[in-house]
């Protein structure tokens, strides 16, 4: 048994090429579905009813220490960008040994915002490029955990298509 404890290391790649000069951390996007409030006769109060397969806007901010060629390449708003985040999850075995498990996040999206940052002597610029996500895949140890393709209408959890029954009806 492996008890996961932290991300030991990660790297970000654009079209297979490592991006240099990134910032320290990246927050992965939330999977939040739009809801409707349900209330009325026979219902005690109200509740939020999610719409499976539909998701609110998802963003991924890619931080850089300074404005660079790599950062500027992501500022192109006419072309979807393909990023791959590869890392290692550190964990402890039953015997107390440390083991690493691969994690991979694949993202495709269009540039939504470019923040060149600030200029201050002896400091980083805190440059950031924000992508509007069209596709995301999160894998751990080669197994897909979550996959969402907003354009092609696919949403899978653990490799199981969550919308298969709905697709069969349409």
Describe each PLM feature range.
Residues 69-72, 92-97, 137-143:
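Short, cysteine-centered beta-strand-loop-beta hairpins and adjacent loop/turn segments enriched
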Residues 52-56, 77-79, 97-101, 121-125:
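A generic structural micro-feature
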Residues 1-69, 108-119, 160-168:
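Solvent-exposed edge beta-strands and adjacent loop segments
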Residues 65-67, 86-90, 108-110, 134-136:
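Beta-hairpin (beta-strand-turn-beta-strand) motif
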Residues 74-105:
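Short, acidic/charged, Gly/Pro-enriched secondary-structure junctions
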Residues 110-170:
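Mixed-charge, glycine-accented linear interaction segment located at domain edges/termini
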């Amino acid at each position: 048994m492996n008890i996961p404890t932290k991300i030991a290391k990660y790297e970000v790649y654009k079209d297979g090429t490592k991006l240099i000069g990134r910032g320290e951390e990246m927050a992965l996007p939330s999977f939040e579905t739009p809801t409707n409030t349900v209330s009325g006769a026979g219902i005690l109060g109200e509740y939020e009813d999610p719409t499976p397969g539909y998701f609110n806007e998802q963003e991924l901010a890619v931080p850089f220490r300074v404005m660079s060629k790599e950062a500027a390449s992501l500022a192109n708003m006419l072309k979807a960008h393909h990023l791959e985040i590869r890392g290692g999850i550190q964990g402890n075995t039953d015997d107390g040994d440390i083991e690493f498990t691969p994690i991979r996040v694949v993202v495709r999206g269009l540039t939504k915002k470019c923040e060149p940052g600030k200029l201050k002597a002896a400091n980083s610029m805190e440059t950031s490029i924000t992508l509007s996500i069209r596709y995301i895949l999160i894998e751990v140890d080669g197994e897909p955990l979550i996959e969402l393709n907003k354009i092609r209408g696919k949403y899978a959890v653990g490799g199981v298509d969550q919308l298969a029954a709905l697709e069969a009806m349409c």
